[in-house]
Amino acid sequence: MLNFNAYLATYTKPIPNDPVDKVIRNFFSPSSNYTDMSDATRLFTIDKLARDAIPCLKQRYQAGRVNYKTTGCFMADLILYISLIVILGLVFARTIMAVWYAFVGSRRLASTPPPPGKFSATGMRRPRPKSHVAMPDGATHENSMGVAPWAQKGIVTPTPASSKNLPNNNVSLMTPASMTPEDIGNDPYIVCLVTCYSEGLDGISATLSSLSATEYPTNRKLIFVVADGMITGKGESMSTPDVCVSLMTPDMRFGTPTPMKYRSVSSGKKAQNMALVYAGHYQDPSGGESVPMVVVVKCGMPEEAAGQKAGNRGKRDSQMVLMSFFQHVTYNDPMSPLDYDLFRKIHALMGVTPDFFEMVLMVDADTKVHPPALRYLANAMLNDHRIMGACGETRIQNKLQSWVTAIQVFEYFISHHQVKAFEAVFGGVTCLPGCFSMYRIKARKPGFDDWIPVIVKQDIIREYSQTIVTTLHQKNLLLLGEDRFLSTLMLRTFPHRRMVFVPHAVCHTEVPHTLRMLLSQRRRWINSTVHNLMELLLVRDLCGTFCFSMQFVVLMDLIGTCLLYTSDAADDTPC
């Protein structure tokens, strides 16, 4: 409350070109609608110079304070304090739970699981798992070529002398009914999917070497490389498919592959695609055992051969090559020629039919996986059969390349050890990064006599393989952030299963090193985040109630993401 009587007595005449004096005299003019006890706050806040003079006027002419607040000021303060309490409470809760998860929860997941007992709780021997895959015609152990009938023409059968030098030649093949969960033990069959586009020799070789060096039995893991089209990276002398094939020691039983047709996730003329399947082993140049390896090269239809980027259909299509294959294997559905060729060659390489694979590790071609990472992720899956997806910590490989990479180090650390760790407490990690994540292909039922499809469930495959993308919402989900949308689909389809973060599993990847590249990446990420959080808001079965629920956390994340770049400093308006 200000008393301007002393001011008017001192300055009897108006001061020219003084906005503060003008406001005061307008307030006390006879033509004004204000009375002596009216609120003149709005008059002073309209003009910037008058607003800046408020502290000085309060110091010289303050007569007292109003002993009550107006309704507007009271509601503004109420909303402010409630928001402050909720936000600070959420931040502190996230931090405390993340610390607990780092020292207690995650260690339980990463610990070595107990060996599977041969007897159930009732004392009865567990039944042998049923063979839920009817092998296609010719997919028997008598077919030593391991390829489809239409691809056997012109293949040279190796002589007995040369066959002795082939990798894993002494592995005895097992029929699906000859192994039990006890025989598999704590080393389930895992396929490591590596999606490539335009990476060079150094990047792909580093990724394959890191997967080969993981502390996991070589006869229980399969490196599955998908080259997305006939692409040659900038500054590279070899195309990406040639690089992938050159790093593999081919299995002479298969000869020269034949292009096989499959249905891609594109539409129109690109709805059909063809791919070559190379099979063999990867041998790390630094030593170690050879690992079974399959390279799928998407070469395109014959009419694409003369064009640029023949066979290129995107990363989602590369993922669908594997996911669709295992869906057909799990559900015993009719197979495409490409699926059939994959079935034969994987069967011959691994010694078991592909239905034995339970998990898939998805990595990018520029990611280096630490040796214990695969084991830690597999342990988490075995310790809790409700887990359908898990990710590890992604660290920056080129953190000292520029100031742009350096500023991302702390952000990556917080996003994993606070955000993902907090979400993992409730089993609801909303985003498993596409560069390093593991998904469960199928889960064992309690009786060990059947399986529950997880990532290959028909609902997930149908939505993730949409070919007609028209709306802006669909484009942001399927074209800009397909990796995050896959996590959203998993949570929406299986709200009572878990998605976790395993900090013990570590990988290194390269991040954008220029500001232009970083802004382009973050624009895609923000668009994808907003649209995926909107999808998660519709999932009503997430754990918790009201403010103590994952749905409320998702809402807060959505509001924060939308307001992050539109927020501005609040006006210093006195109330």
Task: Identify the role of each PLM range.
Residues 69-87, 543-564:
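Membrane-interface recognition of transmembrane alpha-helix starts
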Residues 565-572:
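Conserved small/polar residues in nucleotide/adenosyl-binding loops
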Residues 4-8, 299-301, 566:
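A short, sequence-level motif marking secondary-structure junctions
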Residues 21-38, 45-71, 191, 231, ...:
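Generic hydrophobic/packing signal
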Residues 123, 127-559:
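Non-transmembrane catalytic domains and loops of membrane-associated enzymes and transporters
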Residues 1-153, 157-159:
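B-type heme-binding environments
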